Regions:
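Transmembrane beta-strands of outer-membrane beta-barrel pores
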Residues: 71-77, 90, 101-105, 146-148, ...
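Outer-membrane beta-barrel signature, preferentially recognizing the C-terminal barrel domain
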Residues: 70, 75, 179, 183-201, ...
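Signature of Gram-negative outer-membrane beta-barrel scaffolds
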Residues: 268-379, 402-404
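Flexible loop and strand-edge segments within Gram-negative outer membrane beta-barrel domains
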Residues: 129-135, 149-207, 211, 217-251, ...
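Gram-negative outer-membrane beta-barrel transporters
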Residues: 309, 442-446, 450, 455-545
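Transmembrane beta-barrel wall of Gram-negative outer-membrane proteins
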Residues: 77-103, 116-165, 194-207, 259-267, ...
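N-terminal periplasmic accessory domains that precede
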Residues: 1, 5, 19-22, 34, ...
Length: 562
């Protein structure tokens, strides 16, 4: 529900895997802006929770040749990495190239065992075996700006390869997690991904009008490899790439056109259109997500009124339309296995389809109204209210298989409707002589909210545990974030911050699954010129508000030095 933009284009990978992270070069980030309220209407229904806008470093104002080298090390997994950048600014042109690489070993964790499918698996030396990896990134950015015209062009490629902990992949087997004496090797099972992105911005400005267009192509190719294993004896070894368990090849075309009209010094309007087309192809001897293609388009209007430096009011509306076509997928080997297990033909017919063909169309509107009030330099108040909706993802409609990154069998529901809800948030900031306080409460009500829920139903797939199914329900969210910041003795800063989220399933009068616990951070920082040292105590509370068939989680304390 949060869109991530890089150079004006939404990042599109396999978002069904929250364990995947973002295929972005962390060294190549100039500024990060967080957008909430009406401004998020510019980016589509999947930005209902806000937008993280990542932009490249600013262009130098004078002609020059420049570069930098950055080195990185981490003790938690023995990371060794670095990045090299070279850039040139000449007249109307600016160009930059960057290469980054990281190598890391097995992750250290503060436990000697984990539980996988009710079995305790040892963690030798408190290192997760085979979780080492490598990352290689290269990117090129160029910009031309002259008078009223501006254009930029970007090409990037991100490659990652990471091992899977073998104790939570496939059939439980303690012998697979025995220490092999090498904490930096990558053996089967592992995952690898390559993300190619090509984007361009074209912009022309008149006195009171700015016309801009963002266009992009992305290819996200993710694969998961594991020594061929079958839970059904009749499944033969594939002739080609026998150890390729899962593969997803996602192609995305994106385009957006926006017109910004500056009516006066206090009034500004924006009109826009955007569209996106995706196609996802699959391969491998296992199944998690079917092939599909998806198209979305939207129209938007946004306006901002700022009569003075004290108050600013903004509002906007957006209409989105989407279409998704999901292909069916039959598992004949599962059907044979179930027959041998004594299932009747009606049950076999039900379970043998990993996914059924689905054709769905969605259309709905969103709107938002926001206020910023700054009565003085010390005080600032913000408030937003709006209606939002989101199209269901392909995984929410049709996933059906074991997701090894999170150790669970995830299943979609083709009957899900679009997500719809009302959201309201506010914030208050006070700054006074080295002291600041910030409080940000929020509340959201969804008439239909889609979430992954533990069902308590045992999967017919062997060694898969219970099924986690995407479900729609009426839901209430409420919570707050708060921060107190104190600057003292010239070089010291103390910050205490906390966050709390309350979730409630109105249909069944219980909490939502995977509700985050209350957490707090106490951070003491010393800084002088370019040198900064800090110590932090992070407290995570116990979570007793859980869904049915979900375990309670104990609290934890983490201590950080940096």
């Amino acid at each position: 529900r949060i869109a991530v933009l890089e150079n004006g284009i939404k990042q599109e990978g396999q978002q069904w895997g929250a364990d995947h992270g973002l295929e972005l070069d962390a060294f190549n980030i100039g500024t990060v802006n967080v957008l909430k309220g009406p401004s998020s209407l510019l980016y589509g229904s999947d930005a209902m929770g806000g937008v993280i806008d990542i932009t490249s470093p600013p262009v130098p104002s004078v002609d020059m040749l420049f570069g930098d080298v950055t080195l990185l090390g981490k003790s938690v997994n023995g990371t060794l990495g670095g990045s090299f950048m070279l850039g040139i600014k000449k007249s109307f042109w600016y160009a930059q190239v960057r290469y980054s690489e990281q190598h890391f070993g097995d992750y250290r964790i503060p436990t000697d065992t984990i539980v996988y499918l009710t079995q305790k698996m040892p963690v030798y030396g408190r290192k997760l075996k085979n979780t080492a990896g490598i990352e290689r990134n290269i990117g090129f950015f160029a910009q031309y700006q002259r008078q009223r015209y501006k254009a930029n062009y970007s090409v990037s490629n991100v490659y990652q390869k990471t091992g899977f902990f073998p104790g939570a992949h496939g059939i439980p087997d303690a012998s697979r997690v025995e220490d092999d004496g090498d904490s930096r090797n990558m053996e089967l099972p592992y995952s690898k991904v390559n993300h190619l992105k090509v984007t361009t911005l074209q912009q022309y400005a008149w006195e009171k009008l700015v016309l801009s267009g963002d266009f992009g192509f992305q290819n996200n190719h993710r694969e998961e490899w594991s020594v061929f294993h079958t839970h059904y004896g009749s499944q033969p070894v594939p002739e080609k790439d026998p150890d390729k368990e899962l593969a997803f090849n996602l192609n995305t075309l994106s385009a957006s056109v926006k017109v910004r009209f500056i009516g006066s010094s206090s009034w500004e309007h924006a009109l826009g259109w955007d569209g996106q087309h995706q196609r996802n192809d699959i391969s491998g001897y296992s199944f998690l997500l079917p092939e599909y293609y998806r198209s979305t388009t939207g129209l938007l209007w946004l306006t901002t009124y700022k009569p003075n430096n004290v108050i600013s009011v903004s509002g906007g509306m957006r209409y989105d339309y989407g279409y998704i076509h999901i292909s069916s997928h039959e598992d004949a080997y599962l059907a044979d296995y179930l027959r041998k297990q004594g299932y009747d033909e009606e049950q076999v017919e039900h379970y043998k389809w990993n996914s059924h063909a689905v054709k769905k169309k969605f259309g709905d509107y969103s709107f938002s109204l926001g206020l910023v009030w700054t009565p003085s330099e010390r005080h600032m108040v913000k408030a937003n209210v709006g209606r939002s909706f989101r199209l269901p993802g392909a995984n929410e409609l049709a996933a059906n298989g074991v997701h090894h990154g999170t150790f669970r069998h995830e299943q979609g529901d083709a009957n899900l409707k679009s997500e719809q809800g009302w959201q309201m948030d506010a914030s208050y900031n006070l700054r006074y002589n080295g002291f600041s306080i910030s409080v940000s409460p929020f509340v959201s009500w969804f008439s239909n909210y889609i979430f992954l829920r533990p069902t308590g139903e045992w999967s017919v797939l062997p060694h898969a545990g219970q099924i986690y199914r995407y479900t729609g329900a009426e839901v209430l969210f409420a919570g707050t974030e708060a921060t107190i910041d104190i600057h003292f003795l010239r070089s010291f800063n103390y910050r205490i911050s906390g966050e709390y989220v309350y979730t409630y399933n109105c249909d069944e009068h219980i909490p939502l699954s995977f509700s985050p616990p209350f957490s707090m951070r106490n951070t003491l920082t010393w800084q002088r010129k370019q040198v900064m040292l800090y110590a932090e105590w992070q407290s995570i509370a116990r979570q007793n508000r859980v869904d049915r068939n979900e375990d309670r989680t104990p609290g934890a304390n983490l201590f950080h030095l940096g």
